[in-house]
Amino acid sequence: MTQKEKNETCIHVTVSGKVQGVFFRESVRKKAEELQLTGWVKNLSHGDVELVACGERDSIMILTEWLWEGPPQAAVSNVNWEEIVVEDYSDFRVR
């Protein structure tokens, strides 16, 4: 395992609050691309947003902190995340 591989991780996240209809997914995509992360983000039927993000641990931590703020119109009440097995995505997509 290379040093780069040791420094990479993936997380599965659920974000709750006023996070739909406020450009949350597009804002997550832009932030993830800025941080050179890969993965996806999508709305859930009950109003939360779900995402998987993969990349360097430092960038993942920056994203998890940013998720508490989100775009200006959002009102985040909870960010629940867990590390998962590293997956190989080529980019970051809105689903």
From Swiss-Prot:
GO molecular function terms noted in the UniProt entry: acylphosphatase activity
Domain of life: Bacteria
Record-listed E.C. numbers: 3.6.1.7
Active-site residue list: 25, 43
Reactions performed catalytically: an acyl phosphate + H2O = a carboxylate + phosphate + H(+)
Keyword list, A-Z: Hydrolase
Keyword Iron: no
Domain Acylphosphatase-like per the UniProt entry, residue ranges: 10-95
Signal peptide feature range: none
Pfam families: Acylphosphatase
Membership in a protein family: Belongs to the acylphosphatase family.
PANTHER family recorded: ACYLPHOSPHATASE, ACYLPHOSPHATASE-RELATED
Protein name: Acylphosphatase
Source organism: Coxiella burnetii (strain RSA 493 / Nine Mile phase I)
Gene name, Swiss-Prot/TrEMBL: acyP
